[in-house]
Regions:
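Alpha-helical scaffold domains
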Residues: 1-151
């Protein structure tokens, strides 16, 4: 089974009620990250990269798979994206490379007008006093790519 098919199969198996809880979504996303990741050949290099960048963990999930996961989350959220907004903060809090990247993708693509939030304020409130530069740059890049105005 191809990596994309394995991920699609995993996501299709998730119950619809999963989208009612940011905790359950975060747990499911942690399970989804390794799907499609090359075998442990890359393990030592991803460990070193994650450690040097200041992440809590780095599984080596390709960006294209993270984008597929973000698309699935946004599609299945329906009209109410409040759970996804809470998920952004939860993902930042876990401090994994995949979590930060997924949080950036979600934050950039949420309907901020409907949620009544400023994406830059959400980003600022999610960060701690010390963050990996890569994480901040990734979030800023995704927000700008999505057409969000700089503050």
């Amino acid at each position: 089974m191809a990596h994309d098919e394995a991920l699609d199969s995993f996501l299709a198996e998730q119950p619809p009620k999963l989208h009612r809880s940011d905790r359950r979504l975060a747990r499911a996303m942690r399970e989804a990250y390794p799907i499609g990741v090359p075998a442990l050949i890359m393990k030592s290099s991803t460990d070193r990269l994650g450690e040097s960048a200041g992440y809590a963990f780095h599984l080596g999930t390709p960006d294209e798979l993270l984008r597929r996961i973000a698309s699935w989350l946004l599609t299945n959220a329906g009209d109410d994206q409040r759970v996804l907004l809470r998920l952004v903060g939860r993902l930042w809090g876990r401090h994994g490379r995949e979590d930060v990247a997924l949080a950036a993708l979600l934050l950039a693509n949420l309907d901020h007008v409907a949620l009544g939030v400023d994406p830059w304020a959400v980003l600022a409130s999610s960060t701690r006093s010390s963050e990996p530069a890569e994480a901040l740059l990734l979030s800023i890049e995704e927000l700008l790519r999505a057409g969000r105005e700089m503050p």
